């Protein structure tokens, strides 16, 4: 039975009074469980009342949205929308991962990077140099010139109180080199040349007018200025010497050897004479020349060793006394014009000429060490004087250990 418009309006779709099978209508009151696209900003859209039934077309669309995946929903929205702006807004709301990736900055090559670093360093250096140049040209920190002294006419100069010295600037101050203390002492004062005093009755000259002074011959600075001690100059006292040749050293040793040999022979012959020994030749061969043959007994060998030890001690005593008390020279060195001086440092100045520091006289301790090493090295079958061939300035091993050097007696200066 057909229903009128009023009755059809009062019942929801799918329901009638007669009963029977009816198709279920999905409810649209609750929100859908699946993701829905981002709503469009439409100012004319009005919210739907919760009790008002929806149209059949909307119910079918909602049922289809539940079954369609988001990708198909996006394709459907793109097909339905014809505006480019709405498509970009929907794509940005539904799939933000579809946005275009950001462009990375281009990587510089090694050559381009080096060029930019070099340019930056050059700009930094120019700025630093400009800053210091501007500070140096700034005259605010320059020390003022002292005011000229005035003297009364016809009278002597009136002594005035000395002006206080200008403040010294620290080395870290950029104006340090402008201070008078950084310029060093006056060369005329260092050389011992006094500044002429002003004449009474004459006023001072203008600062821009220079007095004409006749140049006078000046002797060496060392003669004009008083001699300074090494502690004042800050340098160690030294002296220049000439290094003797190997021939001079050898001849001096030979002279000392013959002198000591005659002393030894004199002592041995005196002992023989006092002992009443008749066989002088055999005794002399054993104890003077120290020759051993097949007839030498063990007792004679022991006596020879005792005599050799006494002889070495005599030689040590001879060199200790001569080098310590006789001006640093044995008779052989004295005849050849040689002497022994202390040497902590030796600097070569010219060929065969060295600066010896401190070049003082040899003490008794140094002389004892030198003599013992020299003589007992020979007794141990190692002649230490051969080492002068290997060390600088013809120094031997005992010279280096004792801190001495053999030079010519007359130094250069």
Swiss-Prot record:
**Which stretches does UniProt call biased (Low complexity)?**
49-64
Where found? Answer: Membrane
User: How does this protein assemble?
Assistant: Component of the HRD1 complex, which comprises at least SYNV1/HRD1, FAM8A1, HERPUD1/HERP, OS9, SEL1L and UBE2J1. This interaction stabilizes FAM8A1 protein, preventing its proteasomal degradation. FAM8A1 binding to SYNV1 may promote recruitment of HERPUD1 to the HRD1 complex.
User: Which GO BP terms sit in this record?
Assistant: ERAD pathway
Q: Does the keyword Transferase apply?
A: no
Q: Does the keyword Thylakoid apply?
A: no
| Source organism of the structure | Homo sapiens (Human)
Q: Where is this region: Necessary and sufficient to interact with SYVN1?
A: 107-139
What is the reported tissue distribution? Ubiquitously expressed, with a higher level of expression in testis.
Which segments show compositional bias classed as Basic and acidic residues? Answer: 1-10, 65-78
Stated name of the protein:
Protein FAM8A1
Give every RDD domain span.
242-408
**Which stretch is the leader sequence?**
none
């Amino acid at each position: 039975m057909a229903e009128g418009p009023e009755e059809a309006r009062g019942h929801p779709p799918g329901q009638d009074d007669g009963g029977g099978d009816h198709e279920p209508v999905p409810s649209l009151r609750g929100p859908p469980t699946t993701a829905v696209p981002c709503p469009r900003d439409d100012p004319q859209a009005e919210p739907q009342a919760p009790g008002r039934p929806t149209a059949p077309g909307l119910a079918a669309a909602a049922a289809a949205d539940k079954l369609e995946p988001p990708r198909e929903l996006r394709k459907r929205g793109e097909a339905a929308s014809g505006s480019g702006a709405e498509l970009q807004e929907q794509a940005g709301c539904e799939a933000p991962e579809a946005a275009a990736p950001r462009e990375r900055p281009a990587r510089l090559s090694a050559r381009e990077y080096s060029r930019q670093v070099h340019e930056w360093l050059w700009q930094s250096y120019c700025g630093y140099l400009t800053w210091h140049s501007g500070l140096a040209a700034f005259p605010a920190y320059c020390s003022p010139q002292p005011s000229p002294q005035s003297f009364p006419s016809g009278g002597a100069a009136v002594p005035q109180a000395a002006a206080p010295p200008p403040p010294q600037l620290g080395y870290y101050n950029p104006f340090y080199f402008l201070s008078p203390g950084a310029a060093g002492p006056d060369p005329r004062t260092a050389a011992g040349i006094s500044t002429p005093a002003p004449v009474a009755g004459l006023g001072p000259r203008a600062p821009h007018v220079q007095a004409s002074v006749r140049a006078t011959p000046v002797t060496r600075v060392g003669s004009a200025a008083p001699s300074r001690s090494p502690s004042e100059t800050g340098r160690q006292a030294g002296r220049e010497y000439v290094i003797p040749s190997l021939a001079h050293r050898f001849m001096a040793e030979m002279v000392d050897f013959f002198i000591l040999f005659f002393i030894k022979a004199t002592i041995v012959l005196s002992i023989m004479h006092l002992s009443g020994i008749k066989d002088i030749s055999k005794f002399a061969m054993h104890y003077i020349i120290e020759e051993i043959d097949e007839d030498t007994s063990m007792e004679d060998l022991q006596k020879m060793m005792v005599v050799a030890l006494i002889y070495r001690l005599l030689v040590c005593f001879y060199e200790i006394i001569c080098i310590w008390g006789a001006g640093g020279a044995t008779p052989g060195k004295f005849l050849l014009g040689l002497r022994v001086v202390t040497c902590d440092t030796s600097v070569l100045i010219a060929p065969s000429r060295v600066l010896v520091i401190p070049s003082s006289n040899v003490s008794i301790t140094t002389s004892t060490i030198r003599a013992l090493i020299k003589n007992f090295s020979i007794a141990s079958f190692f002649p230490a004087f051969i080492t002068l061939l290997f060390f600088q300035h013809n120094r031997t091993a005992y010279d280096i250990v004792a801190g001495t050097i053999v030079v010519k007696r007359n130094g250069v200066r």
